């Protein structure tokens, strides 16, 4: 059985996709239904799959504006994750580039000449052997997706089945990216520079925040800097957004947890105290539970260079929650907090420029 998986953030295309597939369902000559699943994807925006977990194709969709922005801030190098996925699964890779056909080569799109975008697209095809398909708009992208899906469903494509799970780093990047304005690249730098506990406890001074740069050596956007400083001063709304990025913790649960106390209060408490927090539901009250409490403590103290505890002036390794032991471990180091923020900054910027390549731990969807 073949099925199409769409990333839940593709909300501009999904309505068209549902309509196009609905026409197929109503076609009397089409006996088999085409399932569409909307999930969280860590590589690409769409996956064409064959049951149970065979990936046939990975598709990334970008508008001209998105493509231009990715050239400037380093997200263009996300293609490395797609290349790694292809190496592991032998799937085909596609880039959908959305916008009016053949604009003037000198036309500026997001301050990038269209000629530069064409050059980047050519490199994707020639150097990386990635198919590039140009579409007019979201509706046209949906039509091309359905056509591509049918082309695969009519042919047997031999690939290696794979079961992919996210690494701790990817989950931590997702946590930081729950804040508005923080892209995957900026999230990666933050995940490898400091922990959330480090930030909310005020141990990342404003001057260190001001030094943060993207892989292209550009300063972080002012909005992001102001937001990080605001978190260090105890902004409740932003703390709720951060907490909601922890696996199995949504916005409603995060708001309930932080209803009476700041995030720093819970990070200073033993895990057992956090596990006993009473969560009000419609008809009853339940405890947060040890598994969620351990996940909160683990990911809010997670840093690519080390894990930080807010009740100490040294960085110490924290215990790994039993529920996450299946994922890859990260190295820990013992050094003063003021050193980690400077040294890890350079490491993280260099690392982000090369992007994550071990898709052996990426996820198909969760």
Swiss-Prot record:
Top-rank lineage group of the source organism: Viruses
ERCC4 domain sequence ranges: 3-101
Enzyme Commission (EC) number: 3.1.4.-
InterPro entries recorded: ERCC4_domain, Mus81, Restrct_endonuc-II-like
Induction: Expressed in the late phase of the viral replicative cycle.
An annotated Gene Ontology molecular function: crossover junction DNA endonuclease activity
Enzyme class: hydrolase
Pfam families: ERCC4
Annotated keywords: Host-virus interaction, Hydrolase, Inhibition of host innate immune response by virus, Inhibition of host interferon signaling pathway by virus, Interferon antiviral system evasion, Late protein, Viral immunoevasion
Biological process (GO), any one: symbiont-mediated suppression of host innate immune response
GO CC aspect terms: Holliday junction resolvase complex
Gene3D superfamilies the record matches: 3.40.50.10130
SUPFAM superfamilies assigned: Restriction endonuclease-like (SSF52980)
Keyword Nucleotide-binding: no
PANTHER family with a match to the protein in the record: CLASS II CROSSOVER JUNCTION ENDONUCLEASE MUS81, CROSSOVER JUNCTION ENDONUCLEASE MUS81
The family this protein is said to belong to: Belongs to the asfivirus EP364R family.
UniProt function note: Plays a role in the inhibition of type I interferon signaling pathway. Mechanistically, specifically interacts with 2',3'-cGAMP and cleaves it via its phosphodiesterase activity. In turn, prevents 2',3'-cGAMP interaction with host ER-resident STING1 leading to inhibition of downstream signaling pathway and type I interferon production.
Protein name: ERCC4 domain-containing protein EP364R
């Amino acid at each position: 059985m073949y099925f199409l998986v769409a990333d839940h953030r593709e909300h501009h295309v999904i309505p068209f996709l549902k309509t196009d597939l609905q026409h197929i369902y109503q076609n009397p000559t089409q006996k088999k239904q085409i399932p569409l699943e909307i999930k969280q994807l860590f590589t690409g925006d769409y996956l064409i799959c064959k049951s149970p977990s065979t990936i046939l194709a990975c598709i990334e969709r970008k508008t001209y504006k998105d493509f231009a922005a990715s050239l400037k801030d380093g997200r263009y190098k996300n293609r490395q994750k797609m290349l790694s996925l292809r190496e592991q699964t032998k799937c085909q890779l596609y880039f959908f580039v959305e916008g009016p056909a053949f604009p003037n080569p000198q036309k500026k799109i997001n301050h990038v000449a269209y000629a530069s975008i064409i050059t980047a697209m050519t490199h994707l095809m020639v150097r990386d052997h990635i198919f590039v398909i140009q579409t007019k708009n979201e509706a046209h992208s949906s039509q091309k997706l359905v056509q591509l899906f049918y082309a695969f469903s009519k042919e047997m494509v031999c690939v290696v089945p794979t079961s992919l799970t996210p690494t701790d780093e990817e989950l931590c990047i997702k946590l930081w990216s729950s804040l508005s304005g923080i892209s995957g690249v900026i999230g990666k730098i933050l995940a490898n520079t400091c922990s959330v506990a480090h930030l909310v406890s005020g141990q990342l001074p404003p001057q260190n925040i001001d030094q943060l740069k993207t892989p292209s050596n550009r300063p972080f956007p002012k909005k992001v800097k102001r937001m990080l400083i605001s978190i260090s001063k105890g902004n409740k709304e932003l703390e709720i957004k951060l907490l909601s990025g922890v696996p199995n913790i949504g916005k409603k649960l995060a708001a309930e947890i932080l209803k009476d106390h700041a995030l720093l209060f819970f990070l200073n408490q033993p895990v057992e105290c956090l596990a006993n927090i009473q969560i009000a539901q419609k008809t009853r009250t339940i405890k947060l539970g040890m598994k969620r409490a351990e996940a909160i403590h683990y990911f809010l103290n997670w840093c690519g260079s080390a894990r930080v505890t807010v009740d100490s002036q040294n960085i110490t390794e924290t215990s790994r929650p039993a529920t996450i032991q299946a994922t890859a471990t990260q190295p820990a180091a013992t050094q003063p907090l003021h050193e980690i923020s400077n040294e890890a900054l350079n490491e993280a910027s260099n690392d982000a420029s090369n992007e994550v390549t071990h898709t052996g731990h990426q996820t198909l969807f969760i």
